[in-house]
Every structure is written in structure tokens, then in C-alpha cells.
Amino acid sequence: MTAIHIADTGLFVAMGHPSKRRYQGVRRFARRNDITFVIPERVYDELTVNISETETPPVDAAIEEQWARIAGQLDYSISLVSRTMDGVQRYIANADNRPADEIERADPALAAVAAQALIEGTADHAYIYTTDRLAGEGAETILQSEGYGDSVTYVNGFRFVEDLLDL
Amino acid sequence: MSSTSNRANGDVIRDFLSVADLLEEPQLAQLYAYLAREGETTVGELMEALDLAQGTAYTYVNQLVDTGVLEATTDGQPRTYTTRDIDLTITTTDSGREYTITAALIDAVGRRTTDEDIDTYINRHGIAGLATALTYAVDRERGDVTHRTMASDLDISPLAAEIILQALRPIVTEYFEIEPSGGSVADIQGVDQDVVSDDT
């Protein structure tokens, strides 16, 4: 079984600096299990924006250490990919009564990266690691409606990082 | 004391200025949050719990009594003090959801002395901004918004939104009912969960 592990911004923020136990716990987990976290392009852009007074999350360190990589471009000509993108966007908009076109496209991109890997057959299961419950549940719901219910798991980024500390 | 104001127009705490002034002093906020959690407390207990000198403890308590957020519950010695409920209610225009955030907000402000992310956010956006962020933190944990929704509403970067939401999360889980969501390590198939090794 091949799985794709897709990581959102919050996972890297929750890990903290490479000197922290949280970061090291996730790295150890990835290495031990030969996992490379896949970061959608929009998420990578978000993580590497330069805001003063704040430490940049350790995404480049994880890429250099080869347990994270940036996802390839999304192929919107695959209809499952574009349907997933639109579906999650609507799901997130509906939760808060907003117009769908106001929803930032990094949220649905997590699910769209999963959809592309599943339909192209590069993975038979997608794990989405996010601290945004709405994005995680939206991805599960929309991909379930596309017949991929058993193939997608939303992993709560906070619980994941905390549980690795306890192991 | 009670007031209602609106998140969207940015005047979250306009009616709340006396308490907002108080919130400028994180030590006072810490003291208030401690009393709110512990109930009736003597000055001696506060000195011990918060590591305060006697003079400082009395100054803080008297200041909070004068502001009206603490009251003495006994006339005998030693006096005990308790918090008066202060309900600041915030209603969003979009969804009509209401939040009573006072105790959580005061606790959050009290943590700025030890939490750099909260301190940075207050320096940039003020206590009123932190109150707004707290409402998004509640909504995020409940699955109504994402950090990106907050970023676009408040015109800040998604990363800045994520950082303050994570800093506020322990407060949200302490003061609000949050259902757990999503899977964790045990739900990831085919992995070795025993990751305790020294390969770093």
C-alpha cells in the first residue's frame, strides 16, 4: 500500500523550531516510516512568507532533510481534481455562510492534491495533516462523495504532534 | 458589567475600556485569571501561588477591587476575594454567533508575559485585536472557519493567523466546549508507532 501524506501550514507551525522536541518527534516518525510529507504549493508559499517578529516555520529544514517536499502542480484538466477543489471551497464557505469565491484556495488544495494522487494511482490512501478542522472534514466529506471515502483520512495536526511526544 | 459589541466593525471593546485599561497590566490579568479559576482566595494564597511580594499583592488586589472586577467576600481576617463576572459578549454580523469571552480574554492577556506570540499579537493589534482573534480561535476549533478565513477577514497573513490561533488554542480548550476531531498517529495505517529512537 502506498500512501500520500499531505501537510498543511499548521503542522509546521505546531512543530516549532528544529531544536524542539515536537519537530524532532515528527522527523523521527517520518524517517522511521519512510514518509515524505507533501506540501501543496500554496501552503509552501504561505509558510515561507516573511513576517517580521516571527520565526519562519521549519519547512525548508524539513525539505533539506528530505522528509518533506513541495507537491507538483495541480492538474485542473482532471475533472476529479477541479470538482474536489470546487467542492471543498463550497463546503468551507457554507460552514460560515460566505460566498464560495471568498474562500482562499489553499484550503481546497489539500484535498485536490489528494484527489490527483488517488486518480493517477500514485497513492491508494491520502492522509491530510491539518490544524484546520474545517479543511480536514471538508476534504473527507467531498472525497467521500466522489467514492473515495475509505481512502482519505483527516489527521488532526495538534493531536498528531502531541501524541508523538508521548510515545 | 455587560456589553455587546460587534466583531466586524472593530469596536469590539469600546464599551469595555475600563477593563481594557486593566488588561494593559498582564500581572493584574494573571491575578484575575487565577481568582476566576480558583474561587475564593486570600491575599496570602495569591502571594504564594503567583510568587508576589506582600506589598505588590495588596496593591494589585486593591486596584482590582477599585476597578470593580474583584470583591471581598468576608469582613473577617484574613479577607477572601472573589471575581465579579464581567460578560463581554461579541456578536458577529455574518453568522450571528455570540461569544462571552471575558475570562478567556483576561487569561490570554495574562499569558503575554510568558508567550511571545500572544505578546507580539497584542503589540500589533491591541487587546481588542486579541479579543477578535479569540473568537476566531473558538470558531476554528469548532470547525466553522479556517486560519485562512481569519487571515482574509482581518487582512493579515495566513501564517500570522495560524500562529496566534495556535497560541490561543490552550485557552480555547480550557474555557469552551470543543469536540475532538480528526485522527491521530493510531489512525495512520502501516506505520511503526514506536518512534522512540535516537536517530536525530
Name each region found by the language model:
Chain B
Residues 1-52, 56-200:
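Haloarchaeal acidic low-complexity proteome signature biased toward cell-envelope/secretome components but also
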